[in-house]
A protein has these predicted regions:
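Short, hydrophobic/amphipathic alpha-helical patches that form generic packing surfaces
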Residues: 27-28, 70-79, 142-143, 427-438, ...
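Second-shell loop/turn segments in exported
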Residues: 57-62, 122-127, 199-200
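Short, polar loop/linker segments at the starts of domains and inter-domain junctions
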Residues: 48-50, 126-135
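Active-site-adjacent substrate/metal-binding segments within catalytic domains
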Residues: 110-129, 140
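Bacterial Sec-dependent N-terminal signal peptides
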Residues: 1-20
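Catalytic-core regions of glycoside hydrolase
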Residues: 83, 87-97, 116-120, 141, ...
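Contiguous, structured surface segment used for ligand recognition
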Residues: 18-110
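Acidic, low-complexity N-terminal propeptides/linkers enriched in Ser/Thr/Asp/Gly that mediate export
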Residues: 497-541
Length: 541
């Protein structure tokens, strides 16, 4: 019996080992790849990864699964010439992997690597299924992301909350937005638009979010759930007798009402919300809340009391939880966060590459005191509206990050974040951003690009490298002070007019670069395309 017990324990150990998220990741990249690596997890007070060699095995070592996955990605890029990207998350690894000749270590003091904007869930991800989400979570882990917004299935939470408050199915569907508009609904900008949603939609999204959160937690990725910040349907005063304020209109859309923190039912409804969230997806350690987004009226609202009530409700649900807030336009209001304890709030400097609020005096959104005592994350927004086109500030993103890090505000800088409105574009910019935490010192843009091209295309080619340098000095060199919202848009998409200038309301059409440089760079890449036949990354670019 003792032998049988020991054998059983060994079998369990083998099953647990096989269930490692890193092994699963490797097998999804290339079947059989997990046999070519040794994975070692080592305790450390800081996030780190090491690349090493033991016999014929490449060793990836790190303090957690996300660090290890980041190390794996680093090895594939800079030792094998394999770049896993949105346009291709699978690759055929060499039968014999290139040996790590000298142990290589990278560590970071950037605790958080954030991902997603609310808008990403509507512009890009509204109809993703588990197959697509699984690839994205793998992409996150490979790029060191450990703090992503996770708002799929929040509509199911609200459905349950409002049902318990006495709302009918029809009334609930008048409040919950349709899939393509839930970003703005959850930012308190509108309600009901794009609905109603069928019952099957709620069930489908709840099931999907459970799988998403399960996989994130297997990696050790901390999901950021939408928290409760006072949003209620616009008719909550008439329906429930609540004391609410009217945040007004957002671009002509009626906003949900804001439940006053002094209303005795604020705590009750917040508790109900968190209870229903916990029931479906478990407790989170991070909650995103963004009341009064983009000009919401605060008339009649005690902002200090509101901030404290929102924080208190979240802490009652989970005493160690942290509020994640977006710095966008006037938010977060200083009066709302000024008296909150340090360590209880993280601020996402959402558009830090163009309109930083961390305390850079050169910014048009300059905040003299930055975010005060609160931790913050340096974010790159880059994409607006899901528009696809070449765009970026390659050199400036590097310079602004280290400028912030070296400033007095650097002591509260705790990470980097991707806050694009639309995903799956301009991979070079996001590759750069996600490497920043692992590079302790400022580095040369051109040298980084040369190494990037080798990683992305699998071999060195001077013509391709020169093409990318040309792009980095033209279309990827948007001026530092330029605040345009993403890529240029084609005037062929504009409403017909005698003198078309803009496509969308906030687009910028004036060239900041010479279009001939982009044409030359494209011609250079085409001239050597035959050398890269079958390389999906070059074909995509």
């Amino acid at each position: 019996m003792k032998i049988i017990h020991i054998l059983g324990m060994l079998l369990v150990a083998l099953v647990v080992k096989a269930a490692s998220p890193i092994e699963g990741l490797l097998e999804r990249i290339d079947k059989g790849a997990s046999r070519k690596f040794m994975i070692e997890q080592v305790k450390s007070p800081v996030d780190f990864f090491e690349l090493d060699q033991k016999g014929d095995k490449v060793v990836i070592r790190g303090n957690n699964y996300v660090s290890i996955a980041t190390g794996l990605n680093w090895y594939l890029k800079y030792h094998v010439g394999i770049h896993l990207s949105w346009n291709g998350m699978q690759a055929e690894l060499p039968e014999v992997l290139p040996a790590v000749k000298q142990k290589e270590r990278h560590e970071t003091d950037m605790k958080y690597r954030y991902d997603f904007n609310y808008c990403t869930f509507s512009y890009t991800m509204a109809f993703w299924d588990w197959t697509r989400w699984e690839k994205e979570i793998d992409w996150m882990a490979l790029h060191g992301i450990n703090l992503p917004l996770a708002m799929v299935g929040t509509d199911g939470v609200w459905y349950n909350v409002l049902s318990k408050l006495g709302y009918t199915k029809e009334e609930i569907n008048d409040f919950v937005a349709g899939p393509g508009f839930q970003a703005w609904w959850l930012m308190n900008n509108l309600e009901g638009w794009g609905g109603p949603n069928p019952d099957s939609w709620y069930k489908q999204q709840i099931a999907l979010q459970k799988r998403i959160v399960k996989r994130m937690r297997e990696y050790g990725i901390e999901p950021v759930f939408p928290g409760y910040s006072g949003m209620v349907p616009h008719n909550a005063k008439e329906k429930l007798g609540l004391n609410v304020s009217d945040p007004g209109l957002w671009n002509g859309y009626r906003r949900p009402a804001f439940l006053q923190p002094t209303d005795p039912r604020f705590e009750e409804i917040a508790s109900l919300y968190y209870k229903e969230m916990n029931k479906l997806y478990g407790k989170a350690d991070y909650y995103s809340m963004d009341p009064f987004h983009e000009g919401g009226s605060v008339a009649g609202v005690d902002l200090d009391a509101a901030g404290k009530a929102i924080m208190q409700a979240m802490k009652k649900n989970n005493p160690k939880a942290v509020w994640v807030a977006q710095a966008w336009q006037a938010n977060p209001r200083p009066q709302m966060i000024g008296n909150l304890e340090a360590g209880d709030l993280i601020v996402l400097d959402l558009f830090a590459e163009s309109r930083p609020q961390w305390g850079d005096p050169a910014s048009t959104w300059y905040r003299k005191d930055g975010f005060g005592q609160h931790d913050w994350i340096y974010c790159m927004l880059l994409n607006y509206g899901g528009n696809v086109g070449l765009h970026g500030k390659l050199k400036h993103v590097i310079d602004e990050f280290y400028k912030a890090k070296e400033s007095p505000f650097g002591k509260t800088l705790k990470g980097v974040g991707m806050t694009m409105e639309g995903s799956e574009n301009n991979p070079v910019m996001f590759e750069l951003l996600t490497e920043l935490p692992w590079c302790p010192q400022r580095f040369d843009k051109d040298q980084w690009l040369r190494e990037y091209t080798v990683a992305r295309y699998g071999k060195s080619n001077p013509t391709v490298q020169d093409a990318w340098i040309l792009l980095s000095n033209s279309i990827y060199n948007c001026p530092d002070a330029n605040t345009q919202q993403g890529t240029h848009e084609s005037v062929f998409c504009a409403r017909p007019t005698e003198h078309p200038y803009q496509v969308s309301s906030w687009s910028e059409m004036k060239d900041y670069y010479d279009p001939n440089d982009v044409i030359r760079a494209a011609a250079m890449m085409v001239s050597v395309a035959d050398e890269f036949k079958g390389n999906n990354n070059l074909e995509y670019d």
